[in-house]
Amino acid sequence: MAEQRITPWDVEVVSTDEVPVAIDYDKIINQFGCEKFNQALADRLEKLSGKPAHYFFRRGIVFAHRDFNLLLDEIANNRPFYLYTGRGPSSKTMHIGHTIPFLLCKYMQDAFKIRLVIQITDDEKFLWKSMRLEDAMAYGRENIKDIVALGFDPKLTYIFSNVEASHHFEENILKISKTINLNEAIKVFGFDMSSNIGQVGFPAKEIAPCFSSSFRFIGKGAMCLVPAAVDQDPFFRLARDKAKALGEKKPSSIYVSLLPDLKGVNRKMSASDPNSSIYLDDAQDTIRKKIIAYAYSGGRKTLEEHREKGGDIDVDVPFEYLKYFLDDDQELEKYRSGYIKGEITSKEMKEKCVVVIQEFVSRYQESRKRVTDDDLRAFIDINKF
């Protein structure tokens, strides 16, 4: 029997089984009340964009949505929309799991040439973590550079620190705050008597960018699309609940599954555990050592048993990483089917994972080296619009 805990601050599947139990995303869809993403939506997106759908859509990594069909209607009718996502800076460098929503945003921005706002929740990390405010802000600035290195268009992208720039939409923060009573906040976010009042007030800040009126440079009435990890859904569910009272359009959202940490598919990768995460500044040999030593395998106890029964693909972390970072569908299928049949061993799966992750991180690091303070200023400058 497994129990899932999915909140913006805690993701884990607790089970009495010896083998880690993967997160049940169908259960999340039912629990959160969102809709399952389907191939028809991916096909329509592809038709409207004129570009092949990102493999995140094809592989079920984008697994759920809220009103994405209505967002596609907006696109079909040439009505404006924009993207919104965020990052909570808990470490100086992001890990590979943090890149997933941003890679999705990059695809959408490239496909539709649309504006993107990225919220850096340095205030949230200060309020929830044992962290100095100065450190949270410093991590935020470094994380902005990490994000810039992914290749966004500076003319279409605004990245902002909540501490430094949320005053630009303070009016909406106040309006949203007034619509949420304490009982509702406790129910949605799990606050209790130990929660500080800063934590209780924070959700209004994450909700505010869902509404185009928070940004003067975005057209009035533009619909917001939020690509995000599913653990952030409580914020956007509440945003949709309050939209009518605020006279705003409900935001649409698409949710990606959570990249597991190295030690098991039952929890997401966390920056707080260096042995369970692969950071974007990890050296090539460090990546190799982490995957070989720590990546949980679905292989059998002996090679003979593995050849006979095949590997357990559902709990194999190296294969999960291939799903996210190997863009060749045919090669991915070769490793999936070969592993299930026992033709590909756990060692071979890990070796392939090492190569793919090393290549991704190496390309990223070359881009990150080129990011300057001037680049950072170009992305955080609200006056450019």
From Swiss-Prot:
Q: Where is this motif: 'HIGH' region?
A: 89-98
CDD domains assigned: TrpRS_core
> Which reaction(s) does the protein catalyse, per the Swiss-Prot or TrEMBL entry?
tRNA(Trp) + L-tryptophan + ATP = L-tryptophyl-tRNA(Trp) + AMP + diphosphate + H(+)
Q: What class of enzyme is it?
A: ligase
Q: List the disulfide bonds.
A: none
Which SUPFAM superfamilies does this UniProt record tie to the protein? Nucleotidylyl transferase
InterPro entries for the chain: aa-tRNA-synth_I_CS (IPR001412), aa-tRNA-synth_Ic (IPR002305), Rossmann-like_a/b/a_fold (IPR014729), Trp-tRNA-ligase (IPR002306)
An example GO CC term for this entry is:
cytoplasm
Alphabetically list the UniProt keywords. Answer: Aminoacyl-tRNA synthetase, ATP-binding, Ligase, Nucleotide-binding, Protein biosynthesis
This entry's Gene Ontology molecular function terms read: ATP binding; tryptophan-tRNA ligase activity
Give the protein family: Belongs to the class-I aminoacyl-tRNA synthetase family.
Indicate what this protein is called per its UniProt record. Answer: Tryptophan--tRNA ligase
